[in-house]
Amino acid sequence: MEMRQGGGFATLTPEILLGPLNDVEQKYAPARLFVAGPMEIPLPSPRVSLVGSRKASRRGLEAAREIARFLVRKDAIIVSGLAEGIDTAAHTSALNNAGRTVAVIATPLDRSYPAGNAGLQDKIMREHLVISQFEIGDSVLKQNFIFRNRTMALISNATIIVEAKDDSGSLHQGWEALRLGRPLFIWRDVLDDPSVKVPQDMLKYGAIRLDELEEILPSLPQNESLLEIVQ
């Protein structure tokens, strides 16, 4: 874990960041969020989370890059957790394709985990937005990552599970997205893996199998870039 000298951090409520929350959204919403970066507040839409395995396969990484590239070309903001694997692929693909990205992290803003992503975190802080619900000085606990995924589901208009096993932390976000009534997409490769059972159960509760990228668009808040292909 890498420490950094912080500055320019702001403290916001979720309502300031996102707009009014309903009772379901308020249940697990953090009381306050710490943010760093120049992105406009309230956050513009659409915002789509890409989540998945830290120890991602080459195929999973390629899928994350492809999905992120497609979405930023439709003016969507890529949200992810700055972890190794799928998260890193999603953030970097957004940046490499002149898109926007938001990192929701499980550490205070003055720390980086993994340490190898410190440079990426700094770049997103300078040019986009990094969000944490953990105050500077807070301990970094295992449960932080579950709380982070709940918050990321709240921030996002939709979540896509790109790659996962049954013990993957990204599944916490999937269940929270369903609880919130937000679209949850599960990439086809996850559902075609016979060793993975939990995502199959998610389909029974409203998750959507994602075979073609265009299938995401009708579920997102509409802007001109999206309307060009939806109509």
Spans of features found by a protein language model:
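Glycine-biased, small-residue-rich flexible motifs in mid-sequence functional cores and linkers
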Residues: R4-Q231
